[in-house]
């Protein structure tokens, strides 16, 4: 997701945000 992607980017190393 876009909103959660920012935080997920830091946690998962950019899996969601890098999608």
Curated annotation (Swiss-Prot):
It is an enzyme of class 3 (hydrolase). One of its GO terms (biological process) is polysaccharide catabolic process. It catalyses: Random endo-hydrolysis of N-acetyl-beta-D-glucosaminide (1->4)-beta-linkages in chitin and chitodextrins. It is found in: Secreted, Cell wall. GO terms for cellular component: extracellular region. Its EC number is 3.2.1.14. Belongs to the glycosyl hydrolase 19 family. Chitinase class I subfamily. Defense against chitin-containing fungal pathogens. This is Endochitinase 2. It comes from Taxus baccata (English yew).
């Amino acid at each position: 997701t876009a909103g959660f992607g920012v935080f997920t980017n830091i946690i998962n190393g950019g899996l969601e945000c890098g999608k």
